Design a protein with these regions (language model features):
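A short, polar/charged loop-to-alpha-helix boundary motif
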Residues: 257-273
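A short beta-strand-turn-helix
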Residues: 34-58
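Short, surface-exposed basic-aromatic patches at helix termini and helix-loop junctions that form
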Residues: 83-84, 106-112
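N-terminal targeting signals for export/organelle localization
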Residues: 1-43, 272-276
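Thiol-based oxidoreductase modules, predominantly thioredoxin-like and allied folds used
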Residues: 89-102, 115-121
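Short active-site neighborhood of thiol/selenol oxidoreductases, capturing the structured segment around
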Residues: 50-80
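Conserved helix-turn-beta segment immediately C-terminal to the redox Cys motif
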Residues: 73-94
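Thiol/selenol-based redox catalytic cores and closely related redox-interacting motifs
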Residues: 120-256
Length: 276
């Protein structure tokens, strides 16, 4: 049987995927104007979503599995920035790996708006965009995930884990002094505990680690809801900011676990030039 010739769309997506892979070896996030066109596969997906067509700026986030550390932490940051995004006229859409049940629980826990999240059973769009699939060594997804958690094939992961324990004076405070947080097996923790331990107005020691422990406890307690299949545990995501004319203003291609932003101290800092 003759092999069909590649279409213009296939060529454009392949060009972007190759560029995406090349970028993943260099800067993780950068203004993309003049560097790359918005891939047709992404534009086609957006064309089918009400309110995500041309005519306004759009922030499109491709999440890994909904039970992934990055997915929950990124969604929590985005949920807190919704008023600012709306004021800046930026429409938001996230696309994650999961199903409707995982979508419902994910949104209820993170506060991310249900109408702004789409789920795919398989990462076909991730693959079309050339996003990093993570380690794919022999042994299956679980050994590969554990290796990535140890920093193998996942640059920056260990440093980011450590930051969660040591604190970061360049990052904002995560837990209000009057807030109570339940993190897994630990007793309820008042936000004032972190103030006594390290002050206030910045990310205190153990503060981010406590938030991540709370996220992990939520996922592990409802594992098959969040992760219906283990096949794509290592798949990473990406961020795309589109101009009203469909040109690409910014992109970030995740290189590893806890790498959903080029500036994890301020994960949404890349939006500053467009937030007014």
């Amino acid at each position: 049987m003759p092999v069909p010739a590649p279409t213009d769309r296939d060529s454009a997506n392949q060009d972007f995927a190759e560029n995406a892979v090349a970028e993943s070896d260099g800067a993780k996030g950068s203004p993309a104007a003049g560097a790359a066109l918005t891939p047709p596969a992404l534009l086609e997906r957006l064309a089918a979503v009400q309110g995500m067509g041309p005519g306004r700026r759009r922030l499109v986030v491709l999440l890994p599995q909904l039970g992934d550390f990055d997915s929950l932490e990124y969604a929590q940051a985005l949920a807190g920035a919704l008023p600012q995004l709306e004021a800046a006229g930026i429409a938001l859409l996230a696309i994650g790996i999961g199903n409707q049940e995982s979508c419902e629980r994910f949104c209820a826990f993170t506060g991310f708006p249900r109408e702004r999240l789409l789920v795919d059973a398989e990462p076909q769009l991730h693959q079309a965009l050339g996003l990093y699939a993570g380690l794919t060594q022999a042994g299956g997804p679980w050994p590969n995930l554990l290796l990535m958690c140890a920093g193998i094939g996942s640059p920056g992961t260990l440093a980011e884990v450590l930051r969660g324990y040591t604190g970061d004076r360049s990052a904002p405070q995560r837990i209000a002094d009057d807030e109570t947080i339940q993190a897994g097996p630990l007793p309820p923790i008042r936000g004032s505990f972190f103030a006594r331990a390290g002050g206030s107005g910045f990310l205190r020691p153990f503060e981010l680690a406590t938030v991540r422990l709370q996220n992990m406890a939520e996922v592990l307690g409802h594992w098959r809801t969040y992760v219906p299949r283990d096949d794509f545990l290592t798949q990473r995501g990406g961020t795309f900011l589109l101009e009203a004319d469909d040109s690409l203003l910014y992109r970030h291609l995740d290189q590893g676990i806890l790498g959903f932003s080029a500036t994890m101290a301020r994960p949404l800092g890349f939006l500053d030039p467009w937030m007014g």
